[in-house]
Amino acid sequence: MQRGAVLLGVVAFLALWPQAGAEPYNLNDPDVRAMINDGRKLMDTCAKANHYIADRWSTYRIEYLEDKGLYHRMLRELVPCLNNFLRTRQEAP
């Protein structure tokens, strides 16, 4: 139940997040910086949990994710990563 709620929250977050071209985020805003950093950590953790060999998102510095397009690509890849994680755990005995 909790897993489904987390996945639903991430999907809702992705659907409601404004898609505004290549305009950069303001990294001087502590809330924006924390959100970008937490998203990167979540993607990195999910990739490690799924034993992904090539986790390119962990190599990006937070300044690179200031680009909205790059950050949104990372979040779009997060949903399949979480789906894979939950599916494999659900199938496990």
From Swiss-Prot:
Residues 23-33 form a propeptide. Its main location: secreted. The cysteine framework is C-C. It comes from Conus victoriae. It comes from the Eukaryota. Keywords: Disulfide bond, Secreted, Signal. Expressed by the venom duct. It is found in: Secreted. Coiled coil: none annotated. Contains 4 disulfide bonds. Residues 1-22 form the signal peptide. This is Conotoxin F_Vc1. One of its GO terms (cellular component) is extracellular region. Belongs to the conotoxin F superfamily. The keyword Disulfide bond applies.
